[in-house]
Design a protein with these regions (language model features):
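N-terminal accessory/pre-domain segments preceding catalytic cores
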Residues: 1-62, 71, 78-88, 148, ...
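Charged/polar, low-hydrophobicity segments characteristic of intrinsically disordered regions
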Residues: 61-67, 140-143
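Contiguous, function-dense segments enriched for cysteine-driven chemistry
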Residues: 68-69, 73, 113
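Hydrophobic/aromatic-rich core segments of domains that either
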Residues: 78, 97-159
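Active-site neighborhoods of divalent-metal-dependent phosphate/nucleic-acid chemistry enzymes
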Residues: 84-85, 89-94, 98
Length: 162
């Protein structure tokens, strides 16, 4: 049965073109980088690698066109595949930091948002990305399900997301 699953995965892999395969491989290693940093390195030492956290993204007069959004969604979808097939489960923070790095590298400067909610007396934290005000890696209603943290101790926020 395991061999059948491997063959099926390999067949799916063959559907990607070279550019997509490169992005998939690159995303897998970027996930590895962020997982290592979050898991083993003090936040203050890797904080500088994130250029903005929870700051409002303005359009600077730009409009988001369909071609940009299509490319952004394709990058996110491929990175989600890499995250699902990683050596361990990648949570929302690792996904967002990986996707942010992939998108920034291609000139799409997106914002990282951090939010919390209380569910059954437990504090739940979540992160998502937006590009020019549009949520790009989560459902549109994420900001109604989580209270976004605008000003808070980043150390506390990231510790909760670990």
């Amino acid at each position: 049965m395991k061999l059948d699953n491997m063959l099926l995965s390999f067949k799916k892999l063959l559907k990607f073109n070279i550019k997509e395969l490169w992005l998939l491989t690159y995303a897998w290693f970027v996930f590895l980088k962020w997982d290592f940093l979050i898991s083993f390195i003090d936040f203050k030492k890797w904080r500088a690698q994130i250029d903005n956290v929870t700051f409002e993204n303005n359009n600077n007069g730009l409009t988001t066109n369909t071609a940009k959004l299509t490319e952004i969604k394709a990058i996110i979808n491929i990175s989600e595949i890499a995250g699902r097939h990683h050596i361990k489960k990648m949570n929302c923070l690792r996904r967002c930091l990986t996707q942010k790095q992939l998108l920034n590298r291609r000139g799409y400067h997106c914002n990282l948002h951090l939010g919390v909610k209380i569910e059954q007396s437990n504090l739940k934290a979540h992160s998502w990305l937006s590009f020019q005000g549009l949520v790009i890696n989560d459902s549109e209603d994420v900001s109604s399900r989580y209270s976004e943290l605008k000003v808070a101790s980043e150390d506390d926020i990231f510790c909760a997301l670990k």
